[in-house]
C-alpha cells in the first residue's frame, strides 16, 4: 500500500503557491498542518494538494 504525501502550501503576495510542509495523507494530520500554518500567517491562503497538484483541502 502506497501512502501519498500531501503538500501544505501558502499563497504568497505575488499569488504563487509555496510548499511549507509535507504531511502523510491522513485527514487529521493534514488539517493540523494547515491550521498551524494559518496561525503563523493569518492573512494568507493555505491549501493542501496531492502529487498531481489536485486540491485536497483549503483554508
Located regions from the model:
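A short, exposed loop/beta-hairpin motif centered on an aromatic-Gly-Thr core
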Residues: 15-28
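Intrinsic disorder/low-complexity segments
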Residues: 8, 24-25, 49
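Short, mixed-charge low-complexity intrinsically disordered segments
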Residues: 38-59
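A generic structural signal for short, solvent-exposed coil/turn residues
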Residues: 2, 14, 38-40
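Short beta-strand segments and strand-loop junctions that repeat across beta-rich extracellular domains
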Residues: 5-18
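Exposed beta-strand and adjacent loop surfaces of beta-rich binding modules
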Residues: 3-7, 43-45
Amino acid at each position: 500500500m502506497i501512502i501519498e504525501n500531501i503538500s501544505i502550501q501558502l499563497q504568497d503576495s505575488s499569488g504563487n503557491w509555496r510548499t511549507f510542509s509535507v504531511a502523510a495523507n491522513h485527514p487529521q494530520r493534514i488539517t493540523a498542518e494547515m491550521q498551524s500554518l494559518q496561525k503563523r500567517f493569518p492573512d494568507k491562503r493555505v491549501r493542501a494538494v496531492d502529487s498531481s497538484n489536485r486540491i485536497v483541502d483549503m483554508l
